[in-house]
Every structure is written in C-alpha cells, then in structure tokens.
C-alpha cells in the first residue's frame, strides 16, 4: 500500500520548476529544510583558478551583504563554493532561507550575467514553452521562494535543467549512523 505525498509537496515541485524556467541562468537549486538553507548553482563555461574563485566568492559575499544591509539584515548563512573541471566551473551559493528573497535571486542572476557574460550557461526554454507573461512568471518565482521558506517543508529537494527539461527530485533524508558499541 502506498501513500500519496501531501499536496504541498506537489505545489513546491511546480513552483521550483517555475523558478528554474523563470531564471534560465540557474543550473540547479537545492533546498535544505532541516538546515533552513537553499543552494543556488550557476555554471560558467570556463575554468576558474583558485585565485579567480576566491575573488568571485568575495565579490558575491560583498554584493549579498550590501544588498541585505539596505534592509538592515545580516545573512545567517552565506557560503560560496566552486567546483571546476577542464571546461566548466560550478559556483554554489548557499543562503539561509530566512533572509533569502526573490530580489536577492535577481541580484545573483544580474551579478553572474554581468561578470560572466556569454560564459554563463543559460539553459534554453523547452520547445513547448509558450511565451509566458513576465508578471506571472515573477509572481510564480515569488511564490516559489516563499514555498522554500515554509517551515512545514520537511523534505529536501533538488531541481535542475537538463536538455530543455526541468527535473525536480526529493532527496532521501540522511540518517545519522549509530556509533558502534565499545567493547
């Protein structure tokens, strides 16, 4: 006998899909409700060396802190990590859900677009994507951020784009391993 997931989870999946469609610059988004964090990943079509990664991370940190200072807020979590291979660098920005907003997401997209230009990987819209109303897409993005911030969310999820499709998966919760008995 199987049980159905609550409607809220289906709504969250739909909203995360809307977020990824609205912001094609996002390579992926991952929620961590137990840590109350969200991780945004951007892909850059160039290999950034350690010095460039550090400068990039420092600039993102400065932009976010300045943005939040306008609202007299401080980030509880603000981490920037980079993973690179020969041709790509993935930049992961981890933020606390309490101070994260759609406006901050727009800031990240503008920052990456300005800094990376054509090197920023932008996922194309699906072939069946109709020209949507920008106001409706913005509203859906706002609801998506609010859904991620919802304290009743208990499941982690990851959403990403692959070959003009948006995929969203719920992640299994990781149980802590029991310590072995001492003899």
Q: What residue ranges belong to the model's regions?
A:
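Structured domain cores in non-transmembrane regions
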Residues: 47-104
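Short glycine-rich, low-complexity/disordered patches
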Residues: 28-35, 69-88, 122-141
